[in-house]
């Protein structure tokens, strides 16, 4: 019984749309009737003028009475149209609010469904895992970018030898002779002269004298060689 008066749930959902359609159609019908009444008013006005021109005042009054009736109907009709327009605007606005609320409710339901399996602890755990993976990726990248042979493992002596070899090759290519080291000037040393003293011993024979002469010659020769080396 209540369904007969209020309709089913589906009918109630379609009621705003049906009301909007019916109101628009009825307003269009009233607008057409309004245009027809305006035409009748204009005709009665013209007929009244013609009756006056012909001198028939009674007919002119009759046309004017009809004109007044049409004008009264036109005013009532305009009031109805204004009321229907206001009602149509209210229903459309209410229906728009309803549809907006439905859309928001569906959005809230979708968000609730999405967040059903989520909580702050799970989100924090996931973010921690992401940070760990990012740090691990950075460490892996740094490890891959390092050279396979470390600088500390290189033999410094081998590097020095290779460096000398390269310098020698460059000198040969550029035809540049190595600069000789500056000869160091040795300071001059004044040595005391060896005294030329001959011991006159009666027991000294000629053989001993010859031996002393040879030793003296060797000493003088050694002294000359030393002076030559020292640049004296």
UniProtKB/Swiss-Prot annotation:
Keyword Transferase: no
Pfam families assigned to the protein according to its UniProt record, in alphabetical order: Snf7
Biased composition (Acidic residues): 209-220
Biased segments, Basic and acidic residues type: 221-232
Location in the cell: Cytoplasm; Endosome membrane
Keywords annotated in UniProt: Cytoplasm, Endosome, Membrane
A GO CC annotation given for this chain: multivesicular body
Main subcellular localisation: cytoplasm
Keyword presence, Phosphoprotein: no
InterPro entries per record: Snf7_fam
Residue stretches of biased makeup (Low complexity): 178-187
Region (Disordered): 178-232
GO biological process: late endosome to vacuole transport via multivesicular body sorting pathway; vesicle budding from membrane
UniProt topology in membrane: Peripheral membrane protein
Role played: Required for the sorting and concentration of proteins resulting in the entry of these proteins into the invaginating vesicles of the multivesicular body (MVB). Also required for the proteolytic cleavage of the transcription factor RIM101 in response to alkaline ambient pH.
Complex and partners: A component of the endosomal sorting required for transport complex III (ESCRT-III).
PANTHER family for the chain: CHARGED MULTIVESICULAR BODY PROTEIN, GH13992P
Family that this chain belongs to: Belongs to the SNF7 family.
Protein name: Vacuolar-sorting protein SNF7
Organism: Kluyveromyces lactis (strain ATCC 8585 / CBS 2359 / DSM 70799 / NBRC 1267 / NRRL Y-1140 / WM37) (Yeast)
Gene: SNF7
């Amino acid at each position: 019984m209540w369904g007969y008066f209020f309709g089913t749930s589906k009918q109630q959902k379609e009621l705003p749309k049906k009301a909007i359609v019916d109101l628009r159609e009825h307003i269009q019908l009233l607008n057409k009737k309004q245009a027809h009444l305006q035409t009748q008013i204009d005709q009665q006005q013209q007929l009244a003028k013609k009756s006056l021109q012909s001198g028939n005042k009674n007919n002119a009054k009759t046309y004017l009475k009809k004109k007044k009736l049409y004008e009264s109907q036109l005013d009532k009709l305009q009031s109805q149209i204004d009321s229907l327009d206001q009602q149509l605007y209210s229903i459309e606005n209410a229906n728009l609010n309803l549809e907006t609320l439905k859309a928001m409710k569906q959005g809230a339901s979708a968000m609730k469904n999405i967040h059903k399996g989520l909580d702050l602890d799970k989100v924090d755990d996931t973010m921690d895992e992401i940070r760990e993976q990012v740090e691990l990726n950075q460490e892996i990248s740094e490890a891959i970018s390092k050279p396979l042979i470390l600088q500390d493992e290189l033999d410094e002596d081998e590097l020095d030898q290779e460096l000398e070899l390269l310098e020698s090759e460059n000198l040969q290519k550029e035809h540049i002779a190595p600069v000789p080291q500056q000869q160091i000037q040795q300071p001059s040393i004044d040595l005391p002269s060896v005294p030329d003293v001959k011991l006159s011993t009666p027991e000294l024979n000629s053989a001993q004298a010859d031996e002393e002469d040879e030793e003296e010659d060797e000493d003088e020769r050694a002294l000359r060689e030393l002076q030559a080396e020292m640049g004296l």
